[in-house]
Regions:
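Glycine-rich, basic loop-to-helix element that forms the pyrophosphate-binding segment
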Residues: 3, 51-67
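Short, well-formed alpha-helical segments that are part of the catalytic scaffolds
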Residues: 1-10
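Short aromatic/hydrophobic "clamp" motif used to bind/position activated sugar donors
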Residues: 72
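A conserved acidic beta->alpha catalytic loop
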Residues: 23-32, 79
């Protein structure tokens, strides 16, 4: 509930925004806790919605369907958001009417400290860090917002559809890529996506996401996600295979510059992705 506590404390006119909380088929006391927060903050437009279909994409699509605003922002339940998050996104879309989507900075918060084996490449699938400087600008070519800190104009979902429910984490399954798929659709038709550094979240990373077992499953399913998305494109698998082979060369070169523990995890990452991509 830490994320919700930060959301209800947003420094922005409560009459101008709403908060949709999607309970993705939980079996614990989530609903009771949320209803307690709603009762304590009656001045806010907070709404609880239950989504029985398990999966992050189902949950996000449910949030879209139950929201009313022209701009829809998304955060996950393992994040601490800055108190100006809503205001920063509203200002961005007001000042840049050409922007169709936006994303902010994501700063990892390793609850037990950052592991010595964590390199910036290995961190990407684990903690999803995102930083492109301190100024508002279009996202660099080939990049896009992180799923846990993004905002999209409703009209884009009307035009392009919502998040692909074949992708996205679901229960113990760690397949991701739903936001990659969505923003690739946006980029294909040329819709501008902006980076908003001060719309920032801190992504909490507990010890359970740093274990050998978890990271092995995560890296493999990153590859599975890449395979699913590649299969949908003309010559997509061939291009993905060629790209992956090239990444092995870069990986081996990087290992020469890393400390042993970092090299081991970098090789583990590459091996896991390759197995998932090639269907091994």
């Amino acid at each position: 509930m830490e994320t919700l506590e930060r959301v209800v404390d947003q420094r922005y006119d409560a009459s101008k925004w709403e908060c949709i909380i999607v309970d993705n088929n939980s079996s614990d006391d989530t609903r009771a806790k949320v209803e307690a927060v709603i009762a304590e903050n009656k001045e806010l437009n907070i709404h609880y919605v239950f989504e029985p279909k398990q999966g992050l994409s189902h949950a996000r699509n449910c949030g879209i369907a139950n929201s009313k605003g022209d701009i829809i922002a998304f955060v996950d339940d393992d994040e601490d958001v800055v108190l100006d998050l809503v205001r920063r996104y509203v200002e961005l879309f007001d000042q840049h009417p050409e922007a169709m989507a936006a994303g902010g900075r994501v700063q990892p918060d390793y609850l037990s400290g950052k592991p010595k084996w964590m390199s910036h490449i290995v961190a990407k699938p684990i903690s999803n860090p995102l930083y492109y400087g301190d100024y508002i600008k279009p996202f660099p070519r080939g990049t896009h917002p992180g799923g846990g800190n993004m905002a999209v104009r409703r009209m884009i979902f009307d035009k392009l559809g919502c998040f692909d429910t074949e992708l996205g984490r679901s229960g113990d399954k760690l397949i991701g890529g739903e936001e990659c798929d969505f923003f690739e659709r946006m980029a294909k038709v040329g819709f501008p996506i902006y980076y908003v550094p001060r719309a920032m979240v801190y992504h909490r990373i507990g010890d359970e996401k740093l274990t050998e077992e978890y990271t092995s499953r995560l890296f493999y399913e990153v590859g599975v996600s890449q395979r699913i998305r590649a299969q949908r494109k003309k010559n997509g698998l061939f291009k993905a295979y060629v790209s992956e082979i090239g990444k092995w060369g870069a990986t081996l070169l990087l290992c020469l510059t890393y400390r042993p523990s970092q090299s081991r995890y970098l090789l583990k990452l590459r091996s896991g992705i390759s197995k998932g991509l090639f269907g091994k």
